[in-house]
Amino acid sequence: MNFNDIDNQMYGNLEEDAELLAELAAIQEEEMGRVSRPAAPARGAPPAARGRPAPAAPANVPGLDPRLLAAALADNHGDGGDEELEMDEDLLNELNGLVGGGGGGGAAPTVPTRAAPRAPGPSGPPPSASAPNSQLGHLKQLHVYYMKAHKSAEQAGEGPKARRYKRAVDKLVELIRAVERGKTIDESEIPVAPPNFSSAAAEPLPPPAPTAQPAHHPPAPPIRQAAHAAESSPPPIPQRKSSAPAPTAAAPPATKEPTDPKKAAIYRILHHRRDLHKQNARAAIADKDKESAKESVEMAKAFDQAIAALNECSADEMDMNDVPPSPPPYRKPAPPQPQAPPTSAGPLGFIEELQQRQQRFQKMAEKAKTEGNERKMKMNMRLAGQFDEAIKEAKRGKLVNVGELPSLPDMGPLPPQTAPGQAAPKLHQRPPPQEVGPLAPSGVEGKSRNQGQLEFLLERQAQFKQAAIHAKSRGDVEAAKKYLVEMKGFDKMIQAAQAGLPVSIKATPIPPQAQTASTTLQPRIQSAAASSSTGVENRGEKLSLLEKTLIEQVRSAETNQMRFTRLGDVGKVRLFEGWGKVAKQDLLLVREVAKRGLQVPKFHYEMRQIPSADLFPDLADDVIELTIVSCRDVPLPSGYETHHANLFIKYTFPAVVNDLPQTGKTKLIAGTASPDFGESIMLNIGSGKSRNSKLQRTFKRGGLKFEVFQKGGFMRSDKLLGTCEWKLEKLEHSAEMEESLPLKDGRKAVGGLLSAKVRIRQPIGDAKAQHIAQKWLILDN
């Protein structure tokens, strides 16, 4: 049974049915009347010219009118969304190379035109068997391309393009169905492939068979072929404007999605955010916003480089917290507001403001003197004298601690202090303290976060290289190998940072140059010896005090440097590196002065806002680390000697989780009344929004309880030697506590001390106080 003849058996031969073809011609004429009404015929014209043509033989039926096809293909909707933008040529070239669109700055690209329909003729030589398959593949590729273009145009809000792409999609669906049924289609019906469309995967279309012009009228062609038959004078088909001119730069090569699940997730995130920047670039070009378009193009290029470098580094070295977030949809920037005309009187400088405030207090003192109020006069004169010292310090170029200067309620803030000879900057609102944490800004002015990370990694690598060379020169081959391995470990991170991919410095090793030896941080200057060697009174005490202060500053800088390294904050790591380096140089200078008997160097203190790193990122958020350090001089039972001691400690943590206290005990240490335990215990404190308030209430009611026991022997129970309780209220504002607690029997002290330490990830109370005002010693020479 021939399945191809089922339609003919059920409905007859539709392509040669005269009545059906006549009805089709009538419908066609009605549609043509809606699209463009022709001029009315002359009054004297015969009725046949005004009326509808009567049904005739199939040979006289014209089929689908080419004028209807021309009207359907015309894009005269009155929309101006596809007009050429007079944009910067460099910007368009960059966008072309990235998204595959936009024209170059040279000659205008050729506008593709649709080939004129050809009249069907007698069939030529049969095409090859691969021709339908290649044609079908080409149509499917075009269909996929126009579907994507239609979605992109709808998302970008481009109505004319979306409607044009929709018509192309519908036409391609119709052509694909026709080819799948084995029917022949005219190539002029295929929508024009855009210039940036790549069909390398498909086989080239075979050239159409040449058709000979018949000398006589052939029988009526089938319906689909009749749709393209040319009339005596068909109207010209309008040229379709290309949706995207030929690109001038090649698009970046596509990167395959990694097989690693972690990398695949990062790949999808980067790809999605890059596409959002591309959409913003297109919208900015359509709005003629050059700056926004250029910025979006640069961001999209950065994401392309990051995607390309994704296969060169491991997923553990990537910190997605550093990836720029998804951009908001593009909006046209508001026009700049007209600025107020500058006033003739500019803001006063720092020294002038100090002088005005001094005069203010002097006038108040004179007024009190005339009133006979001697106490008020002396007070105001003393306050005015403080401004005398501040003005002298400012004129010498030294920093002035404005926090110690008196002020009145109606006085505004002082302008920032500048060096002599420089113009005082305008008053501005003080910015809020920077956030401490992995998402904090880099803190390096004029540089992006990625540039700061790259410079930091290069410096760290150079430091390890110097350390390896120095160790080799000393003959320490093992240390040199270790430093060399650490130096090589920075290569992948540097490559990722150079490609624009964010990296995490949390796990980077600390170079030996950033760690000062413990022997260097031991006090060496003796006050009596330093004074007796020169005969200057109090010289030794001054040098000893300077040394101790500088040692504390070096320790503070190095501790904060390591903490902020674990937090991934490059800016604050560099800040404390600089402070620590200067403090170590000053420390060596003070020791050299004491050694040679030179004059005590001049120095001063300044108030610095120290970024607080009062948190421990190595701890989980739901635990407290308890460290029982040691006991000192524990009172033993009567009749016991020191060698009889066999001590351990029991601890009880208040009920926080499941309303049950957490208890435990340390190991036994025998033979001493001052045992060193050094045991760390992790106590669970739970999590949740109400956790902190519950902990605060618990720590106010009670704290940690310790009980020191002497281990019992045969037929003897353990004997309690002393107890102590530790209030943990300070954890509300501090992340670490360390204290030595006296042992008691009830309320009576029995002698002996117990040392313990507690750490928590971050304070359970006000954790936003991230800057601490601290006096910082600075040597003047």
UniProtKB/Swiss-Prot annotation:
Describe the location of the C2 domain by residue ranges.
Answer: 605-741
Q: Compositional bias (Gly residues) spans?
A: 98-107
Q: Name one GO cellular component term.
A: nucleus
InterPro entries found in the cross-reference section = C2_dom (IPR000008), C2_domain_sf (IPR035892), C2_Freud (IPR037772), CC2D1A/B (IPR039725), CC2D1A/B_DM14 (IPR006608)
Query: What ranges does the record give for the region Disordered, renumbered to this chain?
Result: 32-63, 94-134, 187-296, 313-373, 403-447
User: What is an annotated GO biological process for this record, any one?
Assistant: regulation of transcription by RNA polymerase II
Where do Low complexity bias regions lie?
A: 37-59, 108-118, 244-256
Return the Pro residues bias intervals: 119-129, 204-222, 324-341
MF terms in GO = DNA-binding transcription factor activity, RNA polymerase II-specific; DNA-binding transcription repressor activity, RNA polymerase II-specific; RNA polymerase II cis-regulatory region sequence-specific DNA binding
- Where composition is biased (Basic and acidic residues), the residues are 285-296, 363-373
Which regions are flagged for Basic residues bias?
A: 269-280
- Which PANTHER family does the protein's record reference? COILED-COIL AND C2 DOMAIN-CONTAINING PROTEIN 1-LIKE
Give the family, as the similarity comment puts it. Answer: Belongs to the CC2D1 family.
Report what the protein is called. Answer: Coiled-coil and C2 domain-containing protein 1-like
